[in-house]
Amino acid sequence: MTTVLEWPGKVAAFALGRRLIADAEAGPSLGDGERGPESHLGGGALEREGRLGEGRPHLRDGEGVTHVPALHENLLVVGDNLPALQALLATHRGRVKVVYIDPPYNTGNAHTYKDHGHDHASWLSFMTPRLLLARELMREDGVLFLHLDDKESAWAQLLGHEIFGEDNSLGTLIHQRAKGGGNARSFVRGHDYVHVWARDAGRVGPFLTEKKSPAKLEVIDGRRMLVETDVLRAGFGRYARGSERRLMYEDIVAVKGEKKLAEVDAKLASGEYILRPWGTEGKHAVVRVTPAEKASSKMYSIIKALGGQNDLEPLGLGGVFSYPKPVELVKALVASQTFFDPDAIVLDFFAGSGTTAQAVMAANERDEGSRSFVLVQTPEPLRSKNAKAVVTASGSSDAEFPTISELTAERIRRAADIHSPGLSFTQLEVIE
């Protein structure tokens, strides 16, 4: 029997989400650029959010011009994620393959969407319309990863069952974090939870991971193949830096003998090996190619990943964010459902430090994919000396403290220099 959550404000929260969806279905955003007097009124979250839909949110570029994003355009949308999600329905409804979110944990943190700390009802009312809109953006075979700690895990799981249907729950993954928390009151918590739902579980394939991660994924004759260029070596032991350790096809007889050549020729004939020109001497490397479906295995439910600070240090952003999520974790989640879908769209509407954008870039770098990201982040000040130093050095802000969204954008730029030089993304503002 399914347990149904009840909390003060539940009816209003579901009604809001459904109304925003219905309003979006009624037609595209007006995009006239006019703000109603309700746009910046204060008050409670649901009171303000309840006014959404009266003028239909839309997206503007840096010149103040309404922008209708292309489907596979990399986006950073600055503003409240509820109107942003509604605005995205015009272009992305039913097109998102993966949603990854790491929402505020209801800790009372000032750098979140002003949750109330240990007020489960407020957190549930906050998340409900956002999850309803996220579901509308997902493809029929889309999945949502909801990453959080134990403060809201049980409540979030029941809420997710109600929104997606318990039959569409795909389980819970455990993220094993770096060790720490020696001052914990009872015991050291070394893990987080990642709850997973599908829009339609019957359409979702297995969650995959690579068996041989050092190899490269490529498309050969229309098929995705795992490519290993280091199959044959001239010898064992350490190699001097810059020296060629691969054994070229033309040198097999001299180094390994006729028997080894016959073995390689047989695998060339069967298609297990292919030859590729290598170097400047007209020789060929022996390359093993394996169909991607044979080079993958199902993901294990416990994922070990170090803290995200290790990812920020090489970007010159160390110490800017308190608890950034690890790129390898998000990359593994994204890749698990896009292993055979390298053109997928990935959405993160609690973008924070921008880990998801870098994870998408890293996944594309790994298999030459063209996945795109859609990030949403509020322009809240991040009161950190390191954050101020980064933005001051880049010359992008003269504010007392930079906003989180400014730093999200800066991380995307710096990560692109490493993973995807020349990558472009469009920064937009949501207009309510």
Which positions does each model-derived feature cover?
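Conserved S-adenosyl-L-methionine
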Residues: 5-7, 120-124, 151-153, 327-416
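A generic alpha-to-beta junction signature in SAM-dependent methyltransferases
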Residues: 92-93, 131, 137-139, 164, ...
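Metal-dependent catalytic core segments for phosphate chemistry
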Residues: 97-119, 305, 310-314, 363, ...
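Glycine-rich adenosyl-nucleotide cofactor-binding module
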Residues: 65-87, 310-343, 362
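DnaQ-like (DEDDh/DEDDy) 3′-5′ exonuclease domain used for proofreading
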Residues: 1-100, 108-122, 129, 389-392, ...
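Conserved proline-anchored active-site loop of SAM-dependent methyltransferases
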Residues: 94-109, 160, 346-360
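Conserved Class I SAM-dependent methyltransferase catalytic core
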Residues: 121-173, 374, 404-416
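Active-site-adjacent helix-turn-beta-strand microarchitecture at beta-sheet edges
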Residues: 178, 190-191, 198-319, 323-328, ...
